[in-house]
């Protein structure tokens, strides 16, 4: 049942009450209002009111004015030919309106044109005009005296259509800012109409700067002319006028020789030359009187183009001055980087230099490794032996090469004067035929320079193709050869080099398998990601960041990446296998942790975050699911898919932070910082908020911000509605209250970072250095469940002879068959990804990286780690039971954790 009040008066087509409109732009002029519908480009219909007067057009929305435009600035108003209800108004943009009826649309257009809206000739004020000859007769229609635009030939040659020159513009008359066209009849008719309606005398401003002080119709430059209506006794600037002598407006304007609104044809001409100094602006009028005054250049007329003297905007008719400036700007633009691309070219130049340095570093690490690592101990004369040859294959053939040997003519010997390790040739026992310690060249044309003491002493050593071998560097040279052999023995890894043993977990973007490398017998946790899923979910940057962080970070509380490789469809990352399980699994079993145990875990988490923050990396996904426990009870941070590098700011930009920050909305909802939720930008302080959430959950067994839905939880996080349990200690409550502060600037750790948090009374008895070195025994050691594995030949791929047991069946489980799961997909999509794959630099090998960078120090370490260079740092029962990768008849017994896949898991990261 409807309770709507029924009224006798029918509802109008334009609903809503009539309110006072903002008509201040019309300045108390009579204006006509029309209720219309405004239609935007997307088809949205809005109720508007158009108010038009002799001054301009207003678009009213209720009591407010959306925009106001002068009549002279409107380019056109026209009715839609397809739909007679609609019409459009064009000035800066094209606006579409819809009237109630076609008749109303026609009446609106006629009224607009009557008031001079959209009229190119400038007619306005109801079509009234004023004579320019001083008489009281009304001027004819504006179409009878049009203003024409003449553009002269660039050759400055007069044509038949070019009008004669006329007097220059006065300084007091403002040239239109965007258009050179001056609508004289419109301005005169508006002034005459306003004076006739109000029947009052209004002062008229006349141009100053003319050569004469009077405002008569005679030429200001000395030209002759007759005007009987001029009043020489009136001051030169103001003339009192009324409705009876409204023709004085036209006569005064005609006296300066600028605008003539008589029935004769007037014109405006522009001389557009290639040179701006030669371009002239002349206003011509075909009258009986003759004016002979010099023309005014655009360079002098440009000072009239200011906002105070502008008569409005007309972007569709730009003046010649703006066109000339635009053409100069376009012609001055070279093909090389300019001011518009200075920043971009600078960034790319820096990036190119960095890539060049990296390339040269890798290239020179092979040839000049022994030179770069030379010990600063002084070298004796007998130990010096420098061999220079551009041909690297024949570099070590002979110890003494004659000076007449053939070689590249561009190679030179340069020797530094200040080098303490290389003696001058004059101090060495020399001989004309041979030298015991030779410094030779491959080019025979430069042998005379080696005998010349002055030339050799003034030269320097070029280290590009230099090899220094001495008795103290024999171990380094031998280690270099072993490194080269070891690097040649390293091959690219594939999935066939590993044996899938168990599914450890399933995440949002992939799976984690327990694998064993066939040649070494080492166990790893292999994370497998689908390339197609990564591309669909736009996780390319996160995946590459995770690989970069894991391959570069070296901390006892962070998992290490050993291998990263790929095929056409999948990405593989082999990391440390941590058998203790997830912290979430142990917290779920215990309900809540004692304060000492929670203090130990949160202290190790803070140490790992401090290491990441010192490398300008934020983690952004701290939760018990991403914290693993090793066999001793220490933590390991894993899953760096949401980490972000290059973060130097503690807070975001809207919070007053400086430096690099992030704005991506990502993380687990229960652990999101308020600045991440609001999108204000976040930095390192967002991780300290997550630390507070984690500590609260370990101490109480629940989340600090509980709500019925996620939006209410976000609101309570932003507002900081924290309810602290009474059973917590005072130090724990104080730490949680300072960590869970919504404002990141006031949060604990935002000013001094790790030092501010570690000095809190809650961590008073924590020895941080010993903790980071794993010298403190953990309060809890996880129970490792043992699972027996069947006997398998690591050198063969045939699993049919392997026995099975109750817990693991390798031959029957299709999920553990690499050929079934990760075989090459014969599809067109796989080949498309390989054309320009975003994961082209994903493959990484720790052994190969160690060989390139030369991190091995001695021959013994190289020989001992030649086959197993990627073993975990901490000794684990897995490595002890499987040393050397040998197989026994009874089979292997490995340690693994219980699966944490269950119905009690919270939702993953967003």
From Swiss-Prot:
<feature type="compositionally biased region" description="Low complexity">
    <location>
        <begin position="270"/>
        <end position="290"/>
    </location>
</feature>
<feature type="compositionally biased region" description="Low complexity">
    <location>
        <begin position="422"/>
        <end position="450"/>
    </location>
</feature>
<feature type="binding site">
    <location>
        <position position="527"/>
    </location>
    <ligand>
        <name>ATP</name>
    </ligand>
</feature>
<feature type="compositionally biased region" description="Low complexity">
    <location>
        <begin position="209"/>
        <end position="220"/>
    </location>
</feature>
<feature type="compositionally biased region" description="Low complexity">
    <location>
        <begin position="227"/>
        <end position="239"/>
    </location>
</feature>
<dbReference type="GO" id="GO:0004674">
    <property type="term" value="F:protein serine/threonine kinase activity"/>
</dbReference>
<dbReference type="InterPro" id="IPR011009">
    <property type="entry name" value="Kinase-like_dom_sf"/>
</dbReference>
<keyword id="KW-0597">Phosphoprotein</keyword>
<keyword id="KW-0808">Transferase</keyword>
<keyword id="KW-0418">Kinase</keyword>
<feature type="compositionally biased region" description="Low complexity">
    <location>
        <begin position="859"/>
        <end position="886"/>
    </location>
</feature>
<dbReference type="GO" id="GO:0005737">
    <property type="term" value="C:cytoplasm"/>
</dbReference>
<dbReference type="InterPro" id="IPR008271">
    <property type="entry name" value="Ser/Thr_kinase_AS"/>
</dbReference>
<feature type="active site" description="Proton acceptor">
    <location>
        <position position="621"/>
    </location>
</feature>
<feature type="compositionally biased region" description="Low complexity">
    <location>
        <begin position="169"/>
        <end position="196"/>
    </location>
</feature>
<feature type="modified residue" description="Phosphothreonine; by autocatalysis">
    <location>
        <position position="664"/>
    </location>
</feature>
<keyword id="KW-0067">ATP-binding</keyword>
<feature type="region of interest" description="Disordered">
    <location>
        <begin position="786"/>
        <end position="812"/>
    </location>
</feature>
<dbReference type="InterPro" id="IPR017441">
    <property type="entry name" value="Protein_kinase_ATP_BS"/>
</dbReference>
<feature type="region of interest" description="Disordered">
    <location>
        <begin position="391"/>
        <end position="454"/>
    </location>
</feature>
<dbReference type="Pfam" id="PF00069">
    <property type="entry name" value="Pkinase"/>
</dbReference>
<feature type="compositionally biased region" description="Gly residues">
    <location>
        <begin position="119"/>
        <end position="129"/>
    </location>
</feature>
<keyword id="KW-0723">Serine/threonine-protein kinase</keyword>
<feature type="binding site">
    <location>
        <begin position="504"/>
        <end position="512"/>
    </location>
    <ligand>
        <name>ATP</name>
    </ligand>
</feature>
<feature type="domain" description="AGC-kinase C-terminal">
    <location>
        <begin position="764"/>
        <end position="854"/>
    </location>
</feature>
<feature type="domain" description="Protein kinase">
    <location>
        <begin position="498"/>
        <end position="763"/>
    </location>
</feature>
<feature type="region of interest" description="Disordered">
    <location>
        <begin position="270"/>
        <end position="295"/>
    </location>
</feature>
<dbReference type="InterPro" id="IPR000961">
    <property type="entry name" value="AGC-kinase_C"/>
</dbReference>
<dbReference type="InterPro" id="IPR045270">
    <property type="entry name" value="STKc_AGC"/>
</dbReference>
<dbReference type="GO" id="GO:0106310">
    <property type="term" value="F:protein serine kinase activity"/>
</dbReference>
<comment type="similarity">
    <text>Belongs to the protein kinase superfamily. AGC Ser/Thr protein kinase family.</text>
</comment>
<dbReference type="InterPro" id="IPR000719">
    <property type="entry name" value="Prot_kinase_dom"/>
</dbReference>
<feature type="compositionally biased region" description="Low complexity">
    <location>
        <begin position="788"/>
        <end position="809"/>
    </location>
</feature>
<feature type="compositionally biased region" description="Low complexity">
    <location>
        <begin position="130"/>
        <end position="160"/>
    </location>
</feature>
<keyword id="KW-0547">Nucleotide-binding</keyword>
<feature type="region of interest" description="Disordered">
    <location>
        <begin position="859"/>
        <end position="910"/>
    </location>
</feature>
<dbReference type="GO" id="GO:0005524">
    <property type="term" value="F:ATP binding"/>
</dbReference>
<dbReference type="GO" id="GO:0005634">
    <property type="term" value="C:nucleus"/>
</dbReference>
<protein>
    <recommendedName>
        <fullName>Protein kinase 3</fullName>
        <ecNumber>2.7.11.1</ecNumber>
    </recommendedName>
</protein>
<feature type="region of interest" description="Disordered">
    <location>
        <begin position="119"/>
        <end position="239"/>
    </location>
</feature>
């Amino acid at each position: 049942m409807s309770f709507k009040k029924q009224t006798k008066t029918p509802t109008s087509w334009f609903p809503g009450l009539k309110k006072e409109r903002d008509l201040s732009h019309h300045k108390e002029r009579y204006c006509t209002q029309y209720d219309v519908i405004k239609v935007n480009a997307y088809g949205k219909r809005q109720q508007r009111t158009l108010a038009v007067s002799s001054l301009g057009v207003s678009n009213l929305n209720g009591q407010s004015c959306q925009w106001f435009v002068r009549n002279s600035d409107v380019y056109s108003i026209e009715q839609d030919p397809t739909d007679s209800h609609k019409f459009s108004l064009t000035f800066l943009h094209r606006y579409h309106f819809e009237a109630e009826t076609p008749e109303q649309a026609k009446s609106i257009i006629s009224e607009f044109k009557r008031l001079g809206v959209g009229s190119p000739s400038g007619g306005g004020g109801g079509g009234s005009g004023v004579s320019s000859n001083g008489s009281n007769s009304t001027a004819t229609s504006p179409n009878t005296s049009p203003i024409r635009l003449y553009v002269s030939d660039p050759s400055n040659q007069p044509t038949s259509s070019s009008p004669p020159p006329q007097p220059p513009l006065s300084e007091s008359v403002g040239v239109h800012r965007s258009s050179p066209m001056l609508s004289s009849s419109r301005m005169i008719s508006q002034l005459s109409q306003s004076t006739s309606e109000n029947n009052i005398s209004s002062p008229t401003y006349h141009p100053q700067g003319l050569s004469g002080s009077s405002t008569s119709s005679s030429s200001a430059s000395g030209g002759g002319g007759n005007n009987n209506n001029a009043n020489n006794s009136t001051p030169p600037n103001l003339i009192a006028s009324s409705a009876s002598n409204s023709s004085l407006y036209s006569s005064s304007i005609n006296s300066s020789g600028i605008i003539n609104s008589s029935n004769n044809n007037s014109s405006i001409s522009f001389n557009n030359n290639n040179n701006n100094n030669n371009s002239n602006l002349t206003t011509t009028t075909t009258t009986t009187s003759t004016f002979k005054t010099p023309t005014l250049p655009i360079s002098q007329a440009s000072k009239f183009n200011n906002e105070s003297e502008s008569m409005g905007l007309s972007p569709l008719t730009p003046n010649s001055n703006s066109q000339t400036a635009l053409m100069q700007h376009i012609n001055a633009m070279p093909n090389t980087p300019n001011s518009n691309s200075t920043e971009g070219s600078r960034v790319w130049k820096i990036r190119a230099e960095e890539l060049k340095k990296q390339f040269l570093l890798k290239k020179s690490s092979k040839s000049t490794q022994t030179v770069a690592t030379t010990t600063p101990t002084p070298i004796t004369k007998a130990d010096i032996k420098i061999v220079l040859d551009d041909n690297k294959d024949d570099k070590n053939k002979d110890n003494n090469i004659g000076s007449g040997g053939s070689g590249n003519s561009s190679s030179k010997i340069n020797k530094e004067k200040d080098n303490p390790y290389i003696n001058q040739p004059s101090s060495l026992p020399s001989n004309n035929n041979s030298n015991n310690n030779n410094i030779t060249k491959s080019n025979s044309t430069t042998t005379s320079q080696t005998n010349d003491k002055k030339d050799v002493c003034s030269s320097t050593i070029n280290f590009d193709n230099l090899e220094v071998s001495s008795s103290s560097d024999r171990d380094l040279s031998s280690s270099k050869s072993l490194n080269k052999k070891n690097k040649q023995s390293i091959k690219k890894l594939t999935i066939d080099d590993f044996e899938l043993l168990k599914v450890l977990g399933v995440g949002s973007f992939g799976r984690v398998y327990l694998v064993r490398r066939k040649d070494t017998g080492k166990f790893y946790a292999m994370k497998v990601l689908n390339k197609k899923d990564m591309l669909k979910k736009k996780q390319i940057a996160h995946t590459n960041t995770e690989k970069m962080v894991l391959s570069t970070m070296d901390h006892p509380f962070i998992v290490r990446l050993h291998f990263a490789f790929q095929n056409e469809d999948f990405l593989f990352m082999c990391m440390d296998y941590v058998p203790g399980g997830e912290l979430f699994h142990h917290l779920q079993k215990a309900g809540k942790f004692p304060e000492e145990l929670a203090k130990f875990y949160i202290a190790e988490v803070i140490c790992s975050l401090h290491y990441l923050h010192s490398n300008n990396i934020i983690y952004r996904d701290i939760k018990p699911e991403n914290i693993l426990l090793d066999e001793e009870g220490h933590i390991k941070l894993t899953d760096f898919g949401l980490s972000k590098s290059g973060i130097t700011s503690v807070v975001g930009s809207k919070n007053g932070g400086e430096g690099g920050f992030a704005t991506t909305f990502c993380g687990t909802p229960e652990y999101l910082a308020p600045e991440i939720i609001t999108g204000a930008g976040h930095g390192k302080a967002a991780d300290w908020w997550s630390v507070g959430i984690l500590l609260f959950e370990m101490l109480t067994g629940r989340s600090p911000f509980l709500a019925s839905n996620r939006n209410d939880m976000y609101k309570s996080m932003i507002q900081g509605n924290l309810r602290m349990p009474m059973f917590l200690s005072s130090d724990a409550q104080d730490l949680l209250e300072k960590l869970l502060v919504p404002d990141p600037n006031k949060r604990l750790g935002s000013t001094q970072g790790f030092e501010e948090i570690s000095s809190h009374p809650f961590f008073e008895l924590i020895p941080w250095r010993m903790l980071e070195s794993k010298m403190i025994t953990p309060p809890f050691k996880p129970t490792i469940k043992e699972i027996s594995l069947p006997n398998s030949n690591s050198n063969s791929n045939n699993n049919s002879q392997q026995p099975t047991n109750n817990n693991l069946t390798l031959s029957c489980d299709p999920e553990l068959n690499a050929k079934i799961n990760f075989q090459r997909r014969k599809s067109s999509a796989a080949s498309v990804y390989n054309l320009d794959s975003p994961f082209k630099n994903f493959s990484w090998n720790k052994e190969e990286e160690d060989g390139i960078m030369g991190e091995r120090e001695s021959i013994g370490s190289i020989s001992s780690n030649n086959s197993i260079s990627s073993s975990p740092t901490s000794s684990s029962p897995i490595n002890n039971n499987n040393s050397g990768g040998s197989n026994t008849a009874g089979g292997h017994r490995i340690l693994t954790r219980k699966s944490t896949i269950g119905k009690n898991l919270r939702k993953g990261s967003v």
